[in-house]
Protein backbone atom coordinates (compact mmCIF):
# COMPACT_ATOMS: atom_id res chain seq x y z
CA UNK A 1 0.00 0.00 0.00
CA UNK A 2 2.84 2.35 0.89
CA UNK A 3 4.50 1.57 -2.42
CA UNK A 4 1.28 2.37 -4.22
CA UNK A 5 0.96 5.73 -2.49
CA UNK A 6 4.59 6.54 -3.30
CA UNK A 7 4.14 5.57 -6.96
CA UNK A 8 1.00 7.66 -7.14
CA UNK A 9 2.86 10.67 -5.79
CA UNK A 10 5.54 10.28 -8.44
CA UNK A 11 2.97 10.00 -11.22
CA UNK A 12 1.11 13.06 -9.97
CA UNK A 13 4.35 15.05 -9.87
CA UNK A 14 5.21 13.94 -13.37
CA UNK A 15 1.76 14.91 -14.62
CA UNK A 16 1.78 18.30 -12.87
CA UNK A 17 1.53 21.21 -15.28
CA UNK A 18 4.67 23.22 -15.91
CA UNK A 19 5.28 25.89 -14.84
CA UNK A 20 3.41 26.04 -11.55
CA UNK A 21 5.45 28.92 -10.15
CA UNK A 22 7.57 31.82 -11.48
CA UNK A 23 10.66 30.97 -13.51
CA UNK A 24 13.91 32.74 -12.66
CA UNK A 25 16.16 33.87 -15.50
CA UNK A 26 19.70 34.47 -14.30
CA UNK A 27 21.44 37.33 -16.11
CA UNK A 28 25.11 37.10 -15.10
CA UNK A 29 25.69 40.83 -15.50
CA UNK A 30 24.50 44.03 -13.85
CA UNK A 31 21.09 45.52 -14.58
CA UNK A 32 21.01 47.95 -17.47
CA UNK A 33 23.69 46.28 -19.58
CA UNK A 34 23.28 44.73 -23.00
CA UNK A 35 22.50 41.21 -21.77
CA UNK A 36 20.03 42.50 -19.19
CA UNK A 37 18.27 44.61 -21.82
CA UNK A 38 18.12 41.65 -24.19
CA UNK A 39 16.49 39.34 -21.63
CA UNK A 40 13.97 41.95 -20.51
CA UNK A 41 12.81 42.37 -24.11
CA UNK A 42 11.87 38.69 -24.13
CA UNK A 43 10.19 38.78 -20.74
CA UNK A 44 8.19 41.85 -21.72
CA UNK A 45 6.92 39.98 -24.78
CA UNK A 46 5.89 37.02 -22.61
CA UNK A 47 3.82 39.34 -20.43
CA UNK A 48 2.33 41.47 -23.20
CA UNK A 49 1.33 38.51 -25.35
CA UNK A 50 0.28 36.32 -22.40
CA UNK A 51 2.51 33.46 -23.52
CA UNK A 52 3.06 31.74 -20.16
CA UNK A 53 0.83 30.96 -17.16
CA UNK A 54 3.55 32.09 -14.73
CA UNK A 55 5.82 35.15 -14.75
CA UNK A 56 9.49 35.05 -15.69
CA UNK A 57 11.68 37.02 -13.28
CA UNK A 58 15.16 38.41 -13.94
CA UNK A 59 17.83 37.77 -11.32
CA UNK A 60 21.00 39.78 -11.95
CA UNK A 61 24.10 38.04 -10.58
CA UNK A 62 27.00 40.05 -11.97
CA UNK A 63 30.73 39.84 -11.45
CA UNK A 64 33.84 38.10 -12.76
CA UNK A 65 32.87 38.43 -16.40
CA UNK A 66 29.62 36.52 -15.98
CA UNK A 67 31.13 33.51 -14.23
CA UNK A 68 29.53 34.16 -10.84
CA UNK A 69 26.08 34.09 -12.40
CA UNK A 70 26.78 31.11 -14.62
CA UNK A 71 28.10 29.20 -11.61
CA UNK A 72 24.86 29.96 -9.74
CA UNK A 73 22.92 28.52 -12.68
CA UNK A 74 25.23 25.51 -12.77
CA UNK A 75 24.40 24.75 -9.13
CA UNK A 76 20.66 25.44 -9.43
CA UNK A 77 18.09 22.65 -9.13
CA UNK A 78 17.53 21.03 -12.56
CA UNK A 79 13.77 21.49 -12.44
CA UNK A 80 13.24 24.10 -15.16
CA UNK A 81 12.51 26.89 -12.70
CA UNK A 82 15.97 28.45 -12.98
CA UNK A 83 17.54 29.12 -16.38
CA UNK A 84 20.42 31.22 -17.65
CA UNK A 85 20.81 33.60 -20.57
CA UNK A 86 24.50 33.94 -21.47
CA UNK A 87 26.16 34.71 -24.78
CA UNK A 88 29.49 33.33 -26.02
CA UNK A 89 30.97 34.12 -22.62
CA UNK A 90 29.94 30.55 -21.79
CA UNK A 91 32.67 29.35 -24.16
CA UNK A 92 35.32 32.02 -23.75
CA UNK A 93 35.45 31.97 -19.93
CA UNK A 94 36.22 28.25 -19.98
CA UNK A 95 38.68 28.51 -22.85
CA UNK A 96 40.56 31.39 -21.19
CA UNK A 97 40.65 29.59 -17.84
CA UNK A 98 38.30 31.92 -15.97
CA UNK A 99 35.85 29.05 -15.35
CA UNK A 100 36.18 25.28 -15.16
CA UNK A 101 32.70 24.73 -16.63
CA UNK A 102 31.27 25.39 -20.05
CA UNK A 103 28.56 24.45 -22.56
CA UNK A 104 28.87 20.71 -21.88
CA UNK A 105 27.88 21.29 -18.25
CA UNK A 106 24.47 22.72 -19.17
CA UNK A 107 21.46 21.70 -21.21
CA UNK A 108 21.08 24.18 -24.08
CA UNK A 109 17.57 25.46 -24.75
CA UNK A 110 17.91 27.84 -27.69
CA UNK A 111 20.06 30.46 -29.39
CA UNK A 112 18.19 33.68 -30.05
CA UNK A 113 19.87 36.43 -32.03
CA UNK A 114 23.31 37.34 -33.38
CA UNK A 115 25.13 40.67 -33.11
CA UNK A 116 27.93 41.80 -35.40
CA UNK A 117 31.24 43.15 -34.08
CA UNK A 118 32.80 46.45 -35.16
CA UNK A 119 36.53 47.25 -34.98
CA UNK A 120 36.94 50.93 -34.11
CA UNK A 121 39.59 53.61 -33.60
CA UNK A 122 39.46 57.22 -32.45
CA UNK A 123 38.38 59.74 -35.10
CA UNK A 124 41.86 61.23 -35.56
CA UNK A 125 43.62 57.86 -35.70
CA UNK A 126 46.25 57.59 -38.43
CA UNK A 127 44.69 54.33 -39.61
CA UNK A 128 42.31 54.95 -42.48
CA UNK A 129 41.22 51.34 -42.88
CA UNK A 130 41.70 47.91 -41.34
CA UNK A 131 44.43 46.99 -43.81
CA UNK A 132 46.63 49.83 -42.50
CA UNK A 133 46.00 48.87 -38.88
CA UNK A 134 46.84 45.22 -39.43
CA UNK A 135 49.95 46.06 -41.46
CA UNK A 136 51.23 48.08 -38.50
CA UNK A 137 50.34 45.24 -36.11
CA UNK A 138 52.59 43.02 -38.25
CA UNK A 139 55.40 45.58 -38.58
CA UNK A 140 55.36 46.52 -34.88
CA UNK A 141 54.24 43.46 -32.92
CA UNK A 142 52.79 44.11 -29.44
CA UNK A 143 53.00 47.89 -29.87
CA UNK A 144 49.34 48.56 -30.67
CA UNK A 145 47.15 48.43 -27.57
CA UNK A 146 43.79 46.70 -28.01
CA UNK A 147 41.22 47.44 -25.30
CA UNK A 148 39.24 44.36 -24.25
CA UNK A 149 37.56 42.62 -21.37
CA UNK A 150 40.05 39.78 -20.97
CA UNK A 151 38.46 36.36 -21.36
CA UNK A 152 35.16 37.82 -22.57
CA UNK A 153 33.71 37.59 -26.10
CA UNK A 154 35.04 41.03 -27.14
CA UNK A 155 38.55 39.80 -26.27
CA UNK A 156 37.97 36.79 -28.49
CA UNK A 157 36.76 39.00 -31.32
CA UNK A 158 40.16 40.69 -31.10
CA UNK A 159 41.91 37.31 -31.06
CA UNK A 160 40.03 36.25 -34.19
CA UNK A 161 41.08 39.53 -35.81
CA UNK A 162 44.72 38.97 -34.86
CA UNK A 163 44.56 35.36 -36.03
CA UNK A 164 43.16 36.51 -39.38
CA UNK A 165 46.36 38.34 -40.35
CA UNK A 166 49.51 36.20 -40.13
CA UNK A 167 52.19 37.90 -38.06
CA UNK A 168 49.88 40.46 -36.45
CA UNK A 169 50.28 40.90 -32.69
CA UNK A 170 48.31 43.25 -30.43
CA UNK A 171 48.97 44.05 -26.80
CA UNK A 172 45.68 43.34 -25.06
CA UNK A 173 44.72 45.32 -22.01
CA UNK A 174 41.81 45.07 -19.58
CA UNK A 175 39.31 47.90 -20.11
CA UNK A 176 35.94 46.43 -19.12
CA UNK A 177 32.55 46.99 -20.75
CA UNK A 178 31.53 49.05 -23.77
CA UNK A 179 31.32 52.44 -22.05
CA UNK A 180 34.73 51.93 -20.44
CA UNK A 181 36.27 50.86 -23.75
CA UNK A 182 34.88 54.00 -25.36
CA UNK A 183 36.42 56.19 -22.64
CA UNK A 184 39.79 54.43 -22.96
CA UNK A 185 39.73 54.83 -26.74
CA UNK A 186 38.82 58.52 -26.65
CA UNK A 187 41.37 59.15 -23.91
CA UNK A 188 44.18 57.71 -26.01
CA UNK A 189 44.86 54.86 -23.60
CA UNK A 190 44.19 52.23 -26.28
CA UNK A 191 44.72 52.33 -30.03
CA UNK A 192 41.81 50.14 -31.07
CA UNK A 193 38.89 48.29 -29.57
CA UNK A 194 35.73 46.44 -30.55
CA UNK A 195 32.01 47.05 -30.05
CA UNK A 196 28.86 45.21 -30.96
CA UNK A 197 26.94 46.94 -33.72
CA UNK A 198 24.32 47.89 -31.13
CA UNK A 199 27.00 49.49 -28.92
CA UNK A 200 28.67 51.29 -31.81
CA UNK A 201 25.50 52.97 -33.06
CA UNK A 202 25.16 55.43 -30.12
CA UNK A 203 28.96 55.72 -29.74
CA UNK A 204 29.83 56.65 -33.33
CA UNK A 205 28.95 60.32 -32.79
CA UNK A 206 31.33 60.48 -29.82
CA UNK A 207 34.48 60.88 -31.89
CA UNK A 208 35.28 57.33 -32.95
CA UNK A 209 35.43 55.67 -36.34
CA UNK A 210 34.80 52.08 -37.48
CA UNK A 211 37.33 50.32 -39.69
CA UNK A 212 35.54 47.03 -40.31
CA UNK A 213 32.85 44.63 -39.21
CA UNK A 214 33.72 41.02 -38.41
CA UNK A 215 30.71 39.54 -40.21
CA UNK A 216 30.48 37.38 -43.30
CA UNK A 217 28.60 40.16 -45.06
CA UNK A 218 28.19 43.88 -44.47
CA UNK A 219 25.77 44.79 -41.71
CA UNK A 220 22.45 46.28 -42.83
CA UNK A 221 22.83 49.00 -40.19
CA UNK A 222 26.27 49.95 -41.56
CA UNK A 223 26.11 49.28 -45.31
CA UNK A 224 29.17 51.40 -46.10
CA UNK A 225 31.41 49.63 -43.60
CA UNK A 226 33.45 46.85 -45.26
CA UNK A 227 34.00 43.48 -43.68
CA UNK A 228 37.42 42.34 -42.50
CA UNK A 229 37.56 39.81 -45.32
CA UNK A 230 37.03 42.57 -47.86
CA UNK A 231 40.26 44.05 -46.49
CA UNK A 232 42.22 40.78 -46.70
CA UNK A 233 41.90 39.91 -43.03
CA UNK A 234 40.34 36.47 -42.57
CA UNK A 235 38.35 37.21 -39.42
CA UNK A 236 34.70 36.45 -38.70
CA UNK A 237 33.15 36.67 -35.27
CA UNK A 238 29.80 37.66 -33.84
CA UNK A 239 27.97 37.49 -30.55
CA UNK A 240 25.23 34.87 -30.14
CA UNK A 241 22.75 34.87 -27.25
CA UNK A 242 22.11 31.46 -25.71
CA UNK A 243 19.59 30.19 -23.15
CA UNK A 244 20.76 27.38 -20.85
CA UNK A 245 19.16 25.07 -18.27
CA UNK A 246 21.00 23.20 -15.51
CA UNK A 247 22.21 19.77 -16.59
CA UNK A 248 19.56 17.14 -15.90
CA UNK A 249 16.54 19.37 -16.43
CA UNK A 250 13.65 17.12 -17.61
CA UNK A 251 13.41 17.01 -21.42
CA UNK A 252 9.71 17.91 -21.41
CA UNK A 253 10.46 21.12 -19.51
CA UNK A 254 13.32 21.99 -21.83
CA UNK A 255 10.94 21.38 -24.75
CA UNK A 256 8.38 23.72 -23.17
CA UNK A 257 10.96 26.48 -22.80
CA UNK A 258 12.20 25.92 -26.34
CA UNK A 259 8.69 26.26 -27.79
CA UNK A 260 8.03 29.30 -25.63
CA UNK A 261 11.18 31.06 -26.85
CA UNK A 262 10.21 30.29 -30.44
CA UNK A 263 6.82 31.94 -29.89
CA UNK A 264 8.50 34.90 -28.19
CA UNK A 265 10.89 35.35 -31.12
CA UNK A 266 7.92 35.52 -33.48
CA UNK A 267 6.18 38.36 -31.61
CA UNK A 268 6.11 41.86 -33.05
CA UNK A 269 7.52 43.13 -29.74
CA UNK A 270 10.75 41.16 -30.04
CA UNK A 271 11.13 41.53 -33.79
CA UNK A 272 10.84 45.32 -33.56
CA UNK A 273 13.24 45.69 -30.64
CA UNK A 274 15.86 43.36 -32.14
CA UNK A 275 15.73 45.41 -35.33
CA UNK A 276 16.30 48.57 -33.30
CA UNK A 277 19.30 46.95 -31.60
CA UNK A 278 20.68 45.65 -34.93
CA UNK A 279 20.46 42.05 -33.73
CA UNK A 280 19.85 39.43 -36.42
CA UNK A 281 16.81 37.36 -35.34
CA UNK A 282 18.52 33.98 -35.72
CA UNK A 283 16.87 31.10 -33.89
CA UNK A 284 18.43 27.70 -33.27
CA UNK A 285 17.08 24.70 -31.33
CA UNK A 286 17.52 20.92 -31.30
CA UNK A 287 20.16 19.40 -33.57
CA UNK A 288 20.69 22.75 -35.28
CA UNK A 289 21.52 24.29 -31.90
CA UNK A 290 23.95 21.47 -31.08
CA UNK A 291 25.71 22.07 -34.40
CA UNK A 292 26.04 25.79 -33.62
CA UNK A 293 27.46 25.05 -30.15
CA UNK A 294 29.99 22.54 -31.46
CA UNK A 295 31.07 24.82 -34.29
CA UNK A 296 31.61 27.80 -31.97
CA UNK A 297 33.58 25.61 -29.58
CA UNK A 298 35.78 24.34 -32.42
CA UNK A 299 36.48 27.88 -33.59
CA UNK A 300 38.30 28.60 -30.33
CA UNK A 301 40.68 25.66 -30.66
CA UNK A 302 42.93 27.36 -33.21
CA UNK A 303 43.36 30.58 -31.24
CA UNK A 304 46.66 31.28 -29.54
CA UNK A 305 46.35 32.67 -26.03
CA UNK A 306 49.05 34.89 -24.57
CA UNK A 307 48.06 35.76 -21.04
CA UNK A 308 49.70 38.70 -19.29
CA UNK A 309 52.13 37.78 -16.53
CA UNK A 310 50.50 37.78 -13.12
CA UNK A 311 51.50 40.61 -10.81
CA UNK A 312 52.27 39.98 -7.13
CA UNK A 313 49.36 40.64 -4.75
CA UNK A 314 48.93 44.35 -4.03
CA UNK A 315 49.51 43.95 -0.30
CA UNK A 316 52.93 42.42 -0.98
CA UNK A 317 53.82 45.32 -3.26
CA UNK A 318 52.81 47.78 -0.55
CA UNK A 319 54.77 45.94 2.13
CA UNK A 320 57.81 45.80 -0.11
CA UNK A 321 57.62 49.54 -0.79
CA UNK A 322 57.23 50.32 2.93
CA UNK A 323 60.19 48.08 3.71
CA UNK A 324 62.40 49.87 1.18
CA UNK A 325 61.38 53.24 2.60
CA UNK A 326 62.18 52.05 6.14
CA UNK A 327 65.64 50.88 5.08
CA UNK A 328 66.30 54.17 3.31
CA UNK A 329 65.22 56.22 6.37
CA UNK A 330 67.34 54.03 8.67
CA UNK A 331 70.41 54.54 6.49
CA UNK A 332 69.87 58.29 6.33
CA UNK A 333 69.55 58.55 10.11
CA UNK A 334 72.50 56.25 10.83
CA UNK A 335 75.46 58.15 12.33
CA UNK A 336 78.47 58.44 10.06
Regions found by a protein language model. Give the residues of each.
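Solvent-exposed coil/turn segments that connect beta secondary-structure elements
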Residues: 88-90, 114, 124, 197-198, ...
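Hinge/capping helix and adjacent helix->loop/strand transition within the periplasmic-binding protein
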Residues: 72-82, 95-180, 230-233, 240-273
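An extracytoplasmic/periplasmic, membrane-proximal ligand-sensing/linker region
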Residues: 20-22, 252-325
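Short beta-strand->loop
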Residues: 104-112, 147, 169-173, 191, ...
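Sec/Tat signal peptide C-region and signal peptidase I cleavage site
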Residues: 11-15
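C-terminal membrane-anchoring or membrane-association module
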Residues: 323-336
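N-terminal (or domain-start) structured segment
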Residues: 16-105, 150, 154, 164-194, ...
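Bacterial N-terminal signal peptides
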Residues: 1-10
Amino acid sequence: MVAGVFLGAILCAAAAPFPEKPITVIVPFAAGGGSDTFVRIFLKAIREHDLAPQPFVVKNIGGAGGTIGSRAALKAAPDGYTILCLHDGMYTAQHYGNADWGPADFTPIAATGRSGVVVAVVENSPYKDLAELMADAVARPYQLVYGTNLGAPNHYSALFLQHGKPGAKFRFTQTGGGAKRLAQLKGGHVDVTGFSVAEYEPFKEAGIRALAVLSEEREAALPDLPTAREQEVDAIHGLMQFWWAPKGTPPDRVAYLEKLLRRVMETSTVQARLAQLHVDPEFHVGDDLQDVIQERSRELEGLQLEKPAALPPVHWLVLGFVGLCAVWVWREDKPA
